[in-house]
Amino acid sequence: MNKIYNPKSDTWTSILERPTKTVDDIEATVKEIFNEVQKKGDTAVAKYTSLFDGVKIETIEVSKAEIALAIASVSIELKEAISLAKSNITKFHIAQKTERIEVETIEGVKCWQEKRPIQKIGLYIPGGTAPLFSTVLMLAVPAEIAGCNEIVLCSPPDKNGIINPAILYAANLCGVTKILKVGGIQAIAAMTFGTQSVPKVYKIFGPGNQFVTVAKQLATQFGVAIDMPAGPSELLIVADDTAVPAFVASDLLSQAEHGADSQVILVSTSKKLIDAVENEIQIQLEVLPRRAIAKKSIANSKLIFVENDTIALELINEYGPEHFIICSEFDDFYSNGVYNAGSVFIGNYTPESAGDYASGTNHTLPTNGYAKNYSGVNLDSFTKAMTFQKISQKGIQNIGKAIEIMAEAEGLHAHKNAVTLRLNAIENGK
């Protein structure tokens, strides 16, 4: 852990620098796999699944029998927990629905906007040591609410050719229309181009390692949208003497266990709290099953002391954290003043884990400073805003002259003529 006291603002950028890795060698691998999947479809997918996941898959699509077996193997306790989380996520995302917006901008000119679902959605769900079935809820629930009629899910199989049962259970519960045993670069490529088994989709969502991240970025060159740029998980906590050191330490560790490249930062106006949190981290770290991973992240963590809350807020907005926890006497000051954060957690009893699982907000959030210009996943992520206009004769008369003048000024005479013909027809019809 690195303690930093009263850093000058011109040092903030270097102090808050995210862990970065070169992707040049990764890009070459990603392009090679994309090219092969585009040409050979399922054959290429099977090849790379065997190479990277160590298993030969006869049938890529998960069968109904496999889903039924998974459902039976998930404990009642976990099913109940997933049900509660799904209920809260559903409530919060249904509330995000917007009504049709309609305006008569001038007499005879009616304009309106409607949200329409993206028809084909692809979800990528990592497996491995932390199978993120919670991400299925975060992505499939709003996709279903939005009305997406094809929800495709890809997740890597284990050595026995099986996807984690909790992932299958959540996918079935949340209306996923097709589940496929494919992970990594080949999964993103398959959803980008489409194969014999994997449908081509219009937008891809979901987390992943560096290979998946670069693959998603490459997919955009082939007309596929993605949820957002992705990077290692991160958390910034602002806390004062009203915070509970054990709680603060537990939240920092909850992010640190995601990966060695996760970034966790504490900003405080209290040196006493910083020391107490540092001590608590060491105590809690020793009992974590994933402590080897968490220790690497914690070694690069920052414990930053600043003189006052105004400086703290400026630093936080400069950083733009994925997750931002406020444990301060002046929580309104921070919650009203923060402009750059993916999701905000307020108070001693609002752990970041709540947003990860069951409070109802979405845990798919911008990292790597993208909270300055990207939103986290929400209902609108699965829709497009379409605009409509309907103009009467009176309406074209009211705006026609302005259109003619503007079109002529831009040298677009066919644009002008499209209006002139209509105005003349109205005039001649009188």
Please give the residue ranges for each predicted region.
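Short acidic-hydrophobic, aromatic-tinged amphipathic segments that line or gate anion-handling sites
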Residues: M1-P7, K178-G183, L303-N308
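N-terminal Rossmann-like NAD(P)+-binding subdomain of aldehyde/semialdehyde dehydrogenases
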Residues: M1-Q119
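Flexible, glycine/charged-enriched surface loops at secondary-structure junctions
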Residues: T98-V103, A225, S262-V267, V287-S297, ...
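Conserved small-residue-rich beta-alpha loop and adjacent elements
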Residues: V103-Y169
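Conserved NAD(P)+-binding/catalytic subdomain of aldehyde/semialdehyde dehydrogenases
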Residues: L173-Q263
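A glycine- and small/hydrophobic-rich beta-loop-beta segment
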Residues: H258, L266-G337, A341
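C-terminal core of ALDH-fold dehydrogenases
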Residues: N317-K430
